[in-house]
C-alpha cells in the first residue's frame, strides 16, 4: 500500500487575513562599521516574497490547489509587487485597497545564511471598514472547500467572529492560525492551529503531554471548537478532537535552517487537504511532512507536490515509511546487506495509545529496524467484530509510520500474518501480551530460519477497547 497525495487540483480554498510583503537583502560581510559596532553587509541580491496570509495562499497554490486571497493593502509599490508575485504563482487576489495606509512590509538583512536584522514598515489596519471583506467571503463560499483566517493582529481580522459565522452557516470549515491570547474571538471555528508558546500563553505552562491534552480539550469545549492542532516545534504536532484519542505526530524535519513561515505552510496544507476531501487526521499527516520540508529552507518558503510526495513516500528510499509487501522485501534485503538486525511485530493498532507507543519503542530497542504489520479493515472486522476498526487502514498506517520507533509499516489481508512473516523472515519476531512463543503466528518459520521469537508485556491500564467504552460512556453522559 502507498500513501497517495490528496487531489489538490479539485480543492478550492479562500485565505483572508493580514497580507504583507517580505523583502530580503543578501550579501557578504567581512568588517565592522567604523560608525558603530555593527557588521557591514555588501548587498548583492534582493528578493521579494509574499508573506503572512499571502504566504498561506502561496503554499496552497504551490500544491496545485485553487487559492484565493483577500486582504488589506495600501496603494503603493509594495502592493503592486505583492500582486505581481502572487499572480505569477496562480493566486487569485482580491485586495481591498486602503489609501491612508502603507502595505505591510518586512525587510530582512542576511549574510552567510544568518539573519542580522529585521525592519518593519507598517501601520495597523484597525478601524478599517470590514464590509468589503465580508462581501468577498460571501461571494466565494459556494465554490470553496475551506476558509483560512490568517491572523497576524494587523487589523484585517478585526471582525473575525462575523467571518466565522458566515462560513459556518454555509457549511464551510474555518481554519484559523491565531494570534494573541484572546481565543474568545475565534469561538466556533473548525480548527485552531496555535504553536506551543501561543497555546501556553492561553492555558498556562504545560509540563507534560497529558497537561497539553487536558487543557487543550478544555479549550475546545470553552470556545466550541471542532478541533485543536498544537504545533510543537521539534516535538511535532498534537491533534485534539472531542470524543477521539489524541493524535501525537513527531516532527519529520531533518535539518532546521529557518522557521519563518512554517505555520503558514502547516495551515495551508491542512486547508488544501481538507478541501480535497481528505480527513483531518490525513491533513495533519501531510501538514507535518510539509513542515519538515519547509524549515529546511531559508526564508519564507512553500512546498511543491513533488517535495511533499518525497517527504511522505521518499522515506522508503532511506528505509522508512508505509510500504507494499514487495517494497518491504527490498528494504529488508538492503538492511541485511548493511548488517542490520530486523525486528517484526503485528497488530490491529486501531486507536493508538500510550501502551502501543511504549511497546513499539521497546520492540525497536531490540534491533536496528522495526517492521509493523497491520491487519486490513476486513481482517480487523473478522477479528474484532463489525464495529471495528474505528480508524480505516490507511489512517492507522499513516499514524504508525509517523512514530520514531517504527521503520516500516505494511498491511496484510489474512487473519494472521503468517504468510507475510514467512516471506520476510525477520531476525526477531515480537508479540505483545500473554502468548507462549510457539502460539505466535510465524514463529515456526522464524525459528526454522535461525531467528528468535520473543513475547513483550503491554503497559498496564492501556486498552483500545477501554478507550472506546469510555468514549461511548462520555457520549451518553
From Swiss-Prot:
Taxon lineage: Bacteria, Pseudomonadati, Pseudomonadota, Gammaproteobacteria, Enterobacterales
UniProt-annotated binding residues for ATP: 195-198
N6-acetyllysine PTM positions: 179
Function according to Swiss-Prot or TrEMBL: Catalyzes the ADP transfer from ATP to D-glycero-beta-D-manno-heptose 1-phosphate, yielding ADP-D-glycero-beta-D-manno-heptose.
Region named Ribokinase: 1-318
Family indicated by similarity: In the N-terminal section; belongs to the carbohydrate kinase PfkB family. In the C-terminal section; belongs to the cytidylyltransferase family.
GO molecular function, one term: phosphotransferase activity, alcohol group as acceptor
EC number: 2.7.1.167, 2.7.7.70
Enzyme class: transferase
UniProt keyword list: Acetylation, ATP-binding, Carbohydrate metabolism, Kinase, Lipopolysaccharide biosynthesis, Multifunctional enzyme, Nucleotide-binding, Nucleotidyltransferase, Transferase
Protein name, per record: Bifunctional protein HldE
CDD domains: RfaE_like
Segments of this protein annotated with the region Cytidylyltransferase: 344-477
Catalytic activity: D-glycero-beta-D-manno-heptose 7-phosphate + ATP = D-glycero-beta-D-manno-heptose 1,7-bisphosphate + ADP + H(+); D-glycero-beta-D-manno-heptose 1-phosphate + ATP + H(+) = ADP-D-glycero-beta-D-manno-heptose + diphosphate
InterPro entries reported for this sequence: Bifunc_HldE, Carboh/pur_kinase_PfkB_CS, Cyt_trans-like, PfkB_dom, RfaE_dom_I, RfaE_dom_II, Ribokinase-like, Rossmann-like_a/b/a_fold
Domain of life: Bacteria
